[in-house]
Structures are given as structure tokens and as C-alpha cells.
Amino acid sequence: MLHLIIAEAELELVPESIRDHPAVVNYARRRKKRPEEAILDSTYHHAALKKLPDGDRRGRPDIVHICLLNALESIANKEGFLRVYVHTRNDEVIHIKPETRLPRNYNRFLGLMESLFKKGAVPEGLELLRIEKKPLESLIEDINPDTVFIMHEEGELIRPRSFGEILASHQNPVVVVGGFPHGDFMRPIEGTKVSLYREPLMAWTVVSEVIVNFEAALGL
């Protein structure tokens, strides 16, 4: 079983310090929500983000959306060889059942995430997605993997096909992919750093390469 973690994902509700910013207030009014109920999004809150620490990398729920669509629609997931988790910058973990089918439409995805943050689990009765307060280290400890790989542009350069074979040789590997647009992880993560290409890749590209080559190694 491959465990894929989108870590330090820039997925969060609008922080209290900018909830009265005009960009946030106007956006929330258009969507008929209170500012504190809205997901932070750099597309709409760019001016407000300038007032936040790390504002140049925050408000990127689109990264999570694309990564999850790629992972959940993969053959590995459909065949029961994949588990996917999202860990946020605020140390929340989103558990996602394999049968989950996320909205393809980005605005509907935002609405789903807003409901998740508000209710703790969605949809009611099925709980396909569940969020809890938990640091990355505790999530990895719960998974109890036999190895942990951190996808990192400064990691050991390994061809994607070879990396897929390495993953398939383990019983319970964890692969950590950064859910942020640029820069490094904010905190150290124990594991082996791996790079799949000589240049930086977007998170969703890394997710696709990891899963497709894992599938190939399994003969799926």
C-alpha cells in the first residue's frame, strides 16, 4: 500500500488578521459567507496576502485540488493500492476515503473544503473526508510505514521508473509531496529525499509521476 501525503498544503480558512481586508470582505459577500468561513485563495485575496507572513506562498487550494484529482482517479487508487492524505500548514490532517469522487469544478471544490472545515467531516453520514488536528509526524507514526520518501528538488536524483520499482518493493511506503507553490518545507521531515527531475516540478506533476510509475512497477 502506497501512502501519499500532500504535506504543508496551503489550504486554510482566511486568517483572523485579514478578515476585515476589503478583498476578503467583498469576496465573502459575493459568496454569501462570513469571512471566517471562506478558504484563503490567492486568486481572490492577493492584496490581503501581502499582509501575512509567507503571503507569497499561501492561499493555494488549487494545488490540493489538482493533486487529489490526479491521485483519486488513478488506477492505483481504484485497485486499492493507494491511500491519500492532506496535511495543512496549520497541522490539520484530512483523511480521504478511496471511493471519494471530488468535484472537478474548482469553485465546488472550495465549497466542499469550506464545509469540511466547518463540520469536521463531509458528506453527512458518509464522512468521505474527515479533518482533525494532527501534526505530520503523528500522521506518519499512525501509518507506521517501512520507509518514508520526501520529494525534494535537492534530493537524490532517481529516474521515475526506478523510483516506482523502489516503491513497489516496499510493503507500506510513505511518499511526502509538498503542497505549496515554491520554497522548502517549513519543518524538517525524517526520511529519504528524492528528486525525479533535474529541475523543480509542480506538486501535481510529482504526484502523477510517482503514481504512474508505481502502477507500472506493480504491473497495473
Curated annotation (Swiss-Prot):
S-adenosyl-L-methionine binds at G178, G183, L196, Y197, R198, E199, P200, L201. It catalyses: a pseudouridine in rRNA + S-adenosyl-L-methionine = an N(1)-methylpseudouridine in rRNA + S-adenosyl-L-homocysteine + H(+). Transmembrane segments: none annotated. The record marks D62 as: Stabilizes Arg-60. Pfam families: EMG1. InterPro entries: Alpha/beta_knot_MTases, Rbsml_bgen_MeTrfase_EMG1/NEP1, Ribosome_NEP1_arc, tRNA_m1G_MTases_N. Its EC number is 2.1.1.-. The record marks R60, R101, R104, R108 as: Interaction with substrate rRNA. The keyword rRNA processing applies. The keyword Methyltransferase applies. GO terms for molecular function: rRNA (pseudouridine) methyltransferase activity; rRNA binding. Keywords: Methyltransferase, Ribosome biogenesis, RNA-binding, rRNA processing, rRNA-binding, S-adenosyl-L-methionine, Transferase. GO terms for biological process: rRNA base methylation. Belongs to the class IV-like SAM-binding methyltransferase superfamily. RNA methyltransferase NEP1 family. Methyltransferase involved in ribosomal biogenesis. Specifically catalyzes the N1-methylation of the pseudouridine corresponding to position 914 in M.jannaschii 16S rRNA. Homodimer. PANTHER family: NEP1/MRA1, RIBOSOMAL RNA SMALL SUBUNIT METHYLTRANSFERASE NEP1. This is Ribosomal RNA small subunit methyltransferase Nep1. It comes from Thermococcus kodakarensis (strain ATCC BAA-918 / JCM 12380 / KOD1).
